[in-house]
Amino acid sequence: MSAPDDLIAGRYRLQELVGSGGMGAVWKAWDERLHRTVALKQLPLAPGLSPAEADLANQRAMREARITARLSHPYAVSVYDVVEHEGRPCIVMQFLPCVTLARVLQDVGTLQPVEAIKVGSQVAAALAVAHQAGITHRDVKPGNILVADDGTALISDFGISHALGDTTLTSTGLIHGTPAFISPEVARGGEATFASDVFSLGSTLYATLEGEPPFGREPNTIALLHKVASGVFPPPQRAGPVTFLLGQMLSTDPADRPSERLVSPGRLVSPGRRPPH
């Protein structure tokens, strides 16, 4: 168990625990080499892994973090370094005062369409650059979107759930991602793709507008996955001018979903009109 003033990898001095959850503990830390404040996330490994599996998950997490470190975008949390401490991977990232979008929704319930599209367009812009670099997020959801003090939204944790072996057991095998926000093809056991990231972003925007994800919050994971796999959900009632675009993002067929570049304030479309390609 880490504590304030611990030195990680001979370089990062822990100062304050700023968050914790299923995907690890996040510390405010001081980089003693570059003299700057950073965020250090200590990642957990999935329970029940054998030593060999734990080592593989550790290696995957380190690899995913190194890949993400190549991504530079104003709406993506920058990764500075990846180190190992007490057998667990630690990701050193940009530090900024923020809360997760999940916390925002917990506090305010829902967003107005103009607020939701601001969040969506910023995250989509970061995803577009990531996808151009061959990086799939695999777990877009409110908990992985940070909202800074100035209202800017940033996406974080690219590929981490996949790397750590954070999976859900289904009749077709193991799936990566958060069941309430994954795409139908992933719920059926398919691989996550750029198009499935678009669906997950659509699910996130739906939740910001309607107060819950498209397929609800069914506590039975298998039942929820069956709902997601069907692709059938209640039409949004509060999406206003983004209703049509949101419907396309949540298309069951990945080929019918728009690219990330269509998810922007300048590309909003009205119901009944097709967006430009």
Residue ranges and their predicted role:
Residues 14-22, 26:
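Protein kinase glycine-rich loop
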Residues 86-100, 104:
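Conserved short submotifs of the Hanks-type protein kinase catalytic core
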Residues 119-120:
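Activation segment signature within eukaryotic-like protein kinase domains
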Residues 123-135:
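Protein kinase catalytic-loop region centered on the HRD/HxD motif
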Residues 197:
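Conserved catalytic-loop aspartate of Hanks-type protein kinases
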Residues 82:
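Activation-segment/catalytic-loop signature of the eukaryotic protein kinase fold
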Residues 44-70:
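AlphaC helix of the eukaryotic protein kinase fold
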